[in-house]
């Protein structure tokens, strides 16, 4: 181990540490960070060299943050990234600083938004918030309106998580939806992501995603928002159902084919009484 440490440069150590951090399961950033910190044993090197990994993790995970003085949480995403550690809260029309390590928002200030898209953005946000409230007990959504390549574009992001460290599991749902405002019809593009980590008596991760494309009829703001939500609801319901059915099938067939639930003796070993078993006596006499 000592020889390996001598061979690794600081740059290589930071690169490895950053990979661990970026791939930390939902709700386990602090645990992974603390473990990496112990392994690296150089706080300055970690903070300076892996700062990009802290930011990338929060952007990828759609980390929700509460801004003091404002009721609703906002998501940290690439679409709200204004650079230099500042982010946009489009609902409240404010910009704020975000500490990627502490996950804290500070210094909220008024911020300009894309006025040409704002009425569309507001309509979609109102409809999406009602949908999220109905389907996600802990859900947070942020809707952006901006011009991309000259086209008025709506981007809707949803995040919902359950962190159950006491029960040895954590999970997060993320979805991102995008469409341009064009006459008659437009194309809706979405991506749905699920990540779950279960680590009681084992270590299992579910990482899944699905790409979505659908056509959206464009009329006025309110009606278009309603039609958009229908697409979102149908796709997310179908995805969740498919995931549940797939893993139930795997549990009933594939997993059972891979390994017996009980050993050949049809009884589980009580490891606290191992010495009373014949194998325990044999091990003791070995």
Swiss-Prot record:
SUPFAM superfamilies: Subunits of heterodimeric actin filament capping protein Capz. This is F-actin-capping protein subunit alpha-2. GO terms for molecular function: actin filament binding. F-actin-capping proteins bind in a Ca(2+)-independent manner to the fast growing ends of actin filaments (barbed end) thereby blocking the exchange of subunits at these ends. Unlike other capping proteins (such as gelsolin and severin), these proteins do not sever actin filaments. Belongs to the F-actin-capping protein alpha subunit family. InterPro entries: CapZ_alpha, CapZ_alpha/beta, CapZ_alpha/beta_2, CapZ_alpha_1, F-actin_cap_asu_CS. One of its GO terms (cellular component) is cortical cytoskeleton. PANTHER family: F-ACTIN-CAPPING PROTEIN SUBUNIT ALPHA, F-ACTIN-CAPPING PROTEIN SUBUNIT ALPHA-2. GO terms for biological process: actin cytoskeleton organization; barbed-end actin filament capping. It comes from Macaca fascicularis. PROSITE patterns: F_ACTIN_CAPPING_A_1, F_ACTIN_CAPPING_A_2. Transmembrane segments: none annotated. Disulfide bonds: none annotated. The modification N-acetylalanine is found at residue 2. Signal peptide: none annotated. Component of the F-actin capping complex, composed of a heterodimer of an alpha and a beta subunit. Component of the WASH complex, composed of F-actin-capping protein subunit alpha (CAPZA1, CAPZA2 or CAPZA3), F-actin-capping protein subunit beta (CAPZB), WASHC1, WASHC2, WASHC3, WASHC4 and WASHC5. Interacts with RCSD1/CAPZIP. Pfam families: F-actin_cap_A.
């Amino acid at each position: 181990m000592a020889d390996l440490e001598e061979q690794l440069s600081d740059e290589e150590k930071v690169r490895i540490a950053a990979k661990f951090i970026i791939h930390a399961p939902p709700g386990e950033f602090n645990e992974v960070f603390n473990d990496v910190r112990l392994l690296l044993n150089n706080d300055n090197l970690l903070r300076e060299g892996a700062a990009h990994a802290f930011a990338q993790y929060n952007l990828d995970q759609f980390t929700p943050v509460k801004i003091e003085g404002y009721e609703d949480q906002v998501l940290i995403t690439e679409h709200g990234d204004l650079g230099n550690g500042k982010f946009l809260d489009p609902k409240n029309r404010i910009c704020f600083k975000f500490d990627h390590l502490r996950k804290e928002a500070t210094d909220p200030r008024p911020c300009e938004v894309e006025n040409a898209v704002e009425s569309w953005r507001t309509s979609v946000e109102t409809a999406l918030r009602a949908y999220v409230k109905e389907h996600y007990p802990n859900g947070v959504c942020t809707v952006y309106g901006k011009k991309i390549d000259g086209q008025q574009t709506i981007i809707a992001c949803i995040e919902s998580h359950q962190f159950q460290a006491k029960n040895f599991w954590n999970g997060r749902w993320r979805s991102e939806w995008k469409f341009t405002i064009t006459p008659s019809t437009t194309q809706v593009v979405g991506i749905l992501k699920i990540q779950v980590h279960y680590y009681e008596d084992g270590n299992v991760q579910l990482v899944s995603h699905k790409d979505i494309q659908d056509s959206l009829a464009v009329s006025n703001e309110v009606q278009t928002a309603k039609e958009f939500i229908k697409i979102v609801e149908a796709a997310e319901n179908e995805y969740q159902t498919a995931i549940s059915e797939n893993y139930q099938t795997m549990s009933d067939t594939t997993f059972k084919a891979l390994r017996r639930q009980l050993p050949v003796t049809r009884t589980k070993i009580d490891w606290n009484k191992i010495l009373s078993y014949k194998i325990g006596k044999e091990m003791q006499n070995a």
